[in-house]
From Swiss-Prot:
The gene is rsmH. PANTHER family: 12S RRNA N4-METHYLCYTIDINE METHYLTRANSFERASE, S-ADENOSYL-METHYLTRANSFERASE MRAW. This is Ribosomal RNA small subunit methyltransferase H. NCBIfam families: 16S rRNA (cytosine(1402)-N(4))-methyltransferase RsmH. InterPro entries: RsmH (IPR002903), SAM-dep_MeTrfase_MraW_recog (IPR023397), SAM-dependent_MTases_sf (IPR029063). S-adenosyl-L-methionine binds at G35, G36, H37, D55, F81, D103, Q110. Its main location: cytoplasm.
Length: 313
């Protein structure tokens, strides 16, 4: 792989420590990426330990296969972590996993490689798919979606307040010629944005929304969290690193729901609530963020938030 696209793993030591790895434990890395967390975790495992990695990205799978060839304790699977439950059941591991790690979002190699089509800074084909062999590309969505749908994606997933204005500009321009390149789309969005945020590219939010939609990131996260909980053994750890407020909100609400049971929806004076609604998770500590040293070494870690929970039942 080109060194230009090197990935710096975020919250590396913190995430591995949060898993509280046992030498003979069984662990899942739901977002293998370039293997930073997996390699660090393998260093903590003994000869009886096992680690199963997941990723949709073909380039990540190549890296994972190389690691599997080096270390027989590791196996890589080309699946979304949303399908974690199916894989775990097929391997007879449901309820037997000691820790699950999810490091969400897009990796540096994906962002920095223009050919992947994620970046508004480097021109490339307008793709944005984590797995280029599955689903529709960003270009296909932009070419076919109604103006209202484009605006919804920008607003709901990108939290872009000028979503309608941007969608209108895109639909008007596509009547002349289709959008095929990231720079072309970024230029139209930038012109349509009347109020640029200081220190942020005017296309940032729209591109985030488009990427999340194309990859069904939030839907996959909800499915993956449910599957992770079922896969864990009692005492197993769930560690999730998110990079924007939409992801973090889903993670926070999921952990709180299972830490407090469903009792939040019932009257506080209901006498049987504590007996009927037993928590399945215990929240461990407060959300963790990158240290000052990590922020200096890797500015992309500035938005990272890590949450940790332990399975109770």
């Amino acid at each position: 792989m080109n060194a230009t696209y090197r990935h710096i793993t975020v919250l590396l030591e913190e995430a591995v420590s949060a898993l509280a790895p046992r030498e003979d434990g069984c662990y899942l890395d739901g977002t293998f990426g370039r293997g930073g967390h997996s390699r660090a975790l393998l260093e903590k495992l003994g000869t009886g330990g096992r680690l199963l990695g997941f990723d949709k990205d073909p380039q990540a799978i190549q890296t994972g296969k190389a690691l599997a060839a080096e270390d027989g304790r590791f196996v890589i699977v080309q699946r979304s972590f949303a399908e974690l439950g199916d894989e775990v059941r097929a391997r007879g591991l449901e309820g037997r996993v000691d820790g699950v790690l999810l490091d969400l979002g897009v990796s540096s190699p994906q962002l920095d490689d223009p050919e992947r089509g994620f970046s508004f800074l480097n021109d490339g084909p307008l793709d944005m798919r984590m797995n280029p062999g599955q689903g529709i590309s960003a270009a296909e969505f932009i070419a076919s979606a109604a103006e209202e749908e484009i605006a919804r994606v920008f607003k709901e997933y990108g939290e872009e307040r000028f979503a309608k204005r941007m969608a209108r500009a895109i639909v008007q321009r596509r009547q002349e010629r289709p959008f095929e390149r990231t720079a072309d789309l970024a230029e139209v969005i930038t012109v349509a944005n009347p109020a640029w945020e200081k220190g942020k590219n005017p296309a940032t939010r729209a591109f985030q929304g488009l990427r999340i939609h194309v990859n069904n990131e939030l839907g996959d996260l909800e499915r993956g969290l449910d599957a992770a909980l079922e896969s864990l053994a009692v005492g197993g750890r769930l560690v999730v690193i998110s990079f924007h407020s939409l992801e973090d909100r889903i993670v926070k609400l999921f952990m709180r729901k299972h830490a407090k049971g469903e009792a939040d929806n019932l009257p506080r004076d209901l006498p049987i609530r504590s007996k009927v609604f037993e928590p399945r998770l215990k929240l461990l500590g407060k959300p963790q963020y990158a240290s000052e040293a990590e922020l200096k070494a890797n500015p992309r870690s500035r938005s990272a938030v890590m949450r940790v929970a332990e399975k109770l039942k």
